[in-house]
């Protein structure tokens, strides 16, 4: 349930929220940290619930036998508890550091796998291995350091236990000589004291696991503390509420976190229904950023982005994004069939709608020739398709259901001139009422 709740929360975050935590760190928290918390809770339920009853019961029985000898227990227990507290105080920050270094290793792994062709093209495998080795060495160093501190706990606890038992036998013998205690009572007292101290040792071992779980729980809590910038219970889009204009930018400025300067500075424009807006600019000029403000992937720094007469971030995000077909720069396809990828925007899209979208995107010609047509399997990331094929399927997916707004973010870079021209003409003729934003270099 924790993992599911965390996953739902992550999906409710804006791009800026995800950027703040980091994709690799989120994956690590969703997998490793939730497992660590789960193990800690399991250990707590099995041992921590039982141990207090053993300690309390044995302590009561020991006091009933001999109050003076029980003082030894009340000296030993705080000693062990104090060491447990000191170890927790020291190791929790160290466990957090270890997890952060695991995040770094996960980031390097992800980047290496995604950029393996570039790395090999520049013969940088050795450099990447060196960086990964350094990250792993950091994990090893911090793990050894925290392990050394945690290892103090068991020897100290057993030393206190043995000294306590020795003290009981010593002073118990004196009391037996004095006639105030019997041998049987002393034996019973030693057994009770052993139960108490062993229960404390079990708790001490549990603390090591629980300390890891506590550090992981804090990391998970950090993700939950990132508030969604868009309310999931906002208003629904009323496409009949305003015919013209459909999109308005009103003195919009935007800056990425820690970027230093604005990516977009005081931009204003209006797009009416059925119009096509072309945006051309150099690398880093803010074209893609501008496009991502329309579906409210990011919030503006100042000004308003208005769709159908209302600020986009006041809408329910699902309702807003159902009116928008968005094609990012990088074509993203998911494992499954062509049909399943095409139904991503509209779950109940019929084959007729899918084929119509594929034809508009100039993709039906090659999809129809695939081994199983719409049921052809797509490997992870579409690795069994060419760049142009992936782009055309990505474009077709955004066209399913005839969205009111279509955003093409430099999404035809892998297409030849003739195919690109045919695509633009098909969109204009097949979707005359759709407002189109085309971004290009």
What are the language-model segments listed below?
Residues 12-18, 32-45, 49, 53, ...:
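An intracellular "coupling" helix at the cytosolic face of ABC transporter transmembrane type-1 domains
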Residues 61-76, 82, 145-219, 223-224:
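Helix-loop-helix
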Residues 63-64, 87-90:
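Helix-loop junctions at the membrane-solvent interface of multi-pass transporters
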Residues 240-441:
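ABC-type nucleotide-binding domain
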Residues 59, 63, 165, 169, ...:
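Post-Walker A connector loop of ABC transporter nucleotide-binding domains
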């Amino acid at each position: 349930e924790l993992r599911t709740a965390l996953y739902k929360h992550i999906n409710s975050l804006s791009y800026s929220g995800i950027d703040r935590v980091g994709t690799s760190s989120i994956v690590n928290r969703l997998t490793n940290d939730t497992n660590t918390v789960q193990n800690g809770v399991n250990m707590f339920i099995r041992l921590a619930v039982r141990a207090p009853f053993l300690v309390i019961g044995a302590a009561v029985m020991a006091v009933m036998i001999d109050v003076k000898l029980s003082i030894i227990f009340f000296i030993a227990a705080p000693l062990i508890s104090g060491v447990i507290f000191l170890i927790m105080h020291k190791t929790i920050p160290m466990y957090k550091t270890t997890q952060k270094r695991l995040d770094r290793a996960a980031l390097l792994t992800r980047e290496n796998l995604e950029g393996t062709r570039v790395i090999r093209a520049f013969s940088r495998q050795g450099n990447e291995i060196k960086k990964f080795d350094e990250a792993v060495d950091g994990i090893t160093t911090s793990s050894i350091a925290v392990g050394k501190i945690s290892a103090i706990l068991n020897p100290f606890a057993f030393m206190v236990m043995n000294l306590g038992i020795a003290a009981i036998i010593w002073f118990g013998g004196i009391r037996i000589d004095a006639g105030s205690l019997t041998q049987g009572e002393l034996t019973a007292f030693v057994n009770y004291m052993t139960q108490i101290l062993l229960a404390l040792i079990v708790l001490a071992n549990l603390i090591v696991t629980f300390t890891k779980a506590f550090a992981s729980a804090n990391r998970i809590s950090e993700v939950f503390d990132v508030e969604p910038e868009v309310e999931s219970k906002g208003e629904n889009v009323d496409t009949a509420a305003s015919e013209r204009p459909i999109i308005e930018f009103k003195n919009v400025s935007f800056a990425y976190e820690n970027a230093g300067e604005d990516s977009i500075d005081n931009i204003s424009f209006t797009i009416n229904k059925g119009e096509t807006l072309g945006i051309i600019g150099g690398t880093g000029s803010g074209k893609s950023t501008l496009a991502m403000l329309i579906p409210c992937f990011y919030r503006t720094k100042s000004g308003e982005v208005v769709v159908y007469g209302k600020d986009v971030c006041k809408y329910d995000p699902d309702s807003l994004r159902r009116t928008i077909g968005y094609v990012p720069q990088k074509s993203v396809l998911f494992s499954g069939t062509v049909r399943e990828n095409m139904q991503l925007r509209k779950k109940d899209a019929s084959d007729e709608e899918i084929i119509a979208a594929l034809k508009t995107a100039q993709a039906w010609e090659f999809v129809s020739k695939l081994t199983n047509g719409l049921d052809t399997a797509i490997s992870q990331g579409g690795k069994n398709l060419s760049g142009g094929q992936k782009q055309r399927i990505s474009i077709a997916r955004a066209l399913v259901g005839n969205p009111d707004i279509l955003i093409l973010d430099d999404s035809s870079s892998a297409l030849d001139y003739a195919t690109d021209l045919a695509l633009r003409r098909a969109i204009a003729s097949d979707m005359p009422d759709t407002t189109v934003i085309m971004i290009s270099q």
